Regions:
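Short glycine-rich or small-residue beta-strand-to-loop segments that form or flank ligand, phosphate
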Residues: 6-11, 35-37, 63-65, 86, ...
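Glycine-rich phosphate/diphosphate-binding loop of Rossmann-like nucleotide-binding domains
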Residues: 2-43
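Glycine-rich phosphate-binding loop
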Residues: 51-93
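C-terminal binding/interaction regions
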Residues: 5, 11-18, 22, 98-167
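N-terminal beta-loop-helix "entrance" segment that forms/cooperates
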Residues: 36-57
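Short, solvent-exposed amphipathic alpha-helical segments in soluble enzyme
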Residues: 23-29, 53, 80-82, 131-132
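Short glycine/serine/threonine-rich phosphate/pyrophosphate-binding segments
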Residues: 16-20, 44-48, 67-76, 95-98, ...
């Protein structure tokens, strides 16, 4: 991946890559640069801090952070940066991701984590949300978002037409 990136995707374990890759796919669709890596709030806190500290010099504008179970990674990142942090709860325990959802969303005032849905749909939405944030200062990304939303609407119209023809 590029040295200068728009978005840094962090995940607590490499087992989260199958979910978090959906965020990267969304970012790529909008022409954004990104990097994905593993950093654990519990097992490698020094690595987490180094990645946060290096981010401004790399051009990072948004963090997308996925973790399961206790899921403290997004909160730790949010506590140490003023950049937007989007949290993706991951289903990795007997609680089916609800523990990760609550750990990610329940942040104290002044330390926000924008939290999306559990799992791959949430990771996709994290990529789209990051693009929307970055688009505030980049008209070419805003234009790609308009096209993306139009494609979503066109799919709904096509589905409605197919159902209408079956009736």
């Amino acid at each position: 991946m590029a040295t200068t990136i728009d978005v840094l995707i962090l995940m607590g374990s490499d087992s989260d890559a199958a979910v978090m890759s959906a965020a990267g796919e969304a970012l790529t669709e909008f022409g954004l640069t990104w990097e994905m890596t593993v950093a654990s709030a519990h097992r490698s806190p020094a690595r987490v801090m180094r990645l946060i500290d290096e981010a401004p010099g790399r051009g990072v504008k948004v963090f997308i952070v996925g973790a399961g179970a206790a899921a403290h990674l997004a909160g730790v990142v949010a506590a140490h940066t003023t950049m937007p942090v989007i949290g993706v709860p991951i289903d990795s325990s007997a609680l089916k991701g609800m523990d990760a959802l609550l750990s990610t969303v329940q942040m104290p005032p002044g330390v926000p984590v924008a939290t999306v849905a559990i799992g791959k749909p949430g990771a996709t939405n994290a990529g789209v949300l990051a693009a929307q944030m970055i688009a505030l200062g980049r008209p070419e990304i805003a234009a790609k978002l308009v096209d993306y939303k139009k494609k979503l609407a066109d799919k709904v119209e096509a589905a409605a037409e197919r159902l209408k023809n079956k009736a």
